[in-house]
From Swiss-Prot:
It comes from Legionella pneumophila (strain Corby). Coiled coil: none annotated. It catalyses: a 1,2-diacyl-sn-glycero-3-phospho-L-serine + H(+) = a 1,2-diacyl-sn-glycero-3-phosphoethanolamine + CO2. It comes from the Bacteria. This is Phosphatidylserine decarboxylase proenzyme.
Amino acid sequence: MFRDVLKTLPQYLIPKHGITALAGYFADVKSPRLKNFLIRNFIRKFDVDMSEALIEDPKSYDCFNDFFIRHLKPECRPLSQSDVICPVDGCISEIGKIERGQLLQAKGKYYSVQELLACDGQLAEQFVQGQFATLYLSPKDYHRVHMPIDAELVSMTYIPGALFSVQPATTRVVPKLFARNERLAIFFKTKIGPMVMVMVGATIVGAIGTSWHGDVKRAKKLERFDYSERFPDKIISQGSEMGYFKLGSTVVLLFANGEKIQWDKELLAGSKIQLGKPMAIIT
């Protein structure tokens, strides 16, 4: 724990937004020499498997960000027939029941649904006995996010905030981390009731985006986007792409009707998982 504190302490002191803006600038630079240098060294450092990428040649990407949100060959991530599939490549940070409106962040650390969604008590009440899964995407992972279940898009809320790292060491130290960082809460209707996918930003995450909106512009104020009226792409099928991170972060998945969701018993905190793998059955 002391080692985690030492790793995390500098994050309270550094200009996280400034560093993130600078990293985002360089990640969009299209200079062949610079972008090839960044991509080549990233692949080497994180042992990225380019054989899975739809475009295998690192030099074929226009900039680092294009490489980072690269598409995978469809056959590399077949979709299971499970009721609920994993929406990302990553690692399960925590998974389980929402207890009296509280989600487990790490051992001994909790945060509330209302804090996470920056919503009123009436909306948060829907999830008070729900189910949740927190999925961490490491730098080497595929960074597009897909739908875990067929759903209808209802609304989206951009919530400004801090940009702490979301690495495991930080989650064990920083209180209410996912409710403090910049994030995008996306609300859906499913056959078993409300579902929310929260895409959490972090240090050096240049942008969070969705398939219907593109990059969501960073702002100082909370912004809501309503899709309850006529919208061409409201229905999004299981496995379809719904968003992306320009540099890695975390997805928090919430289901309101907890009694309907039975998580796969093999899924525990620390488990590695890939897009399309079974996550839960609907009871």
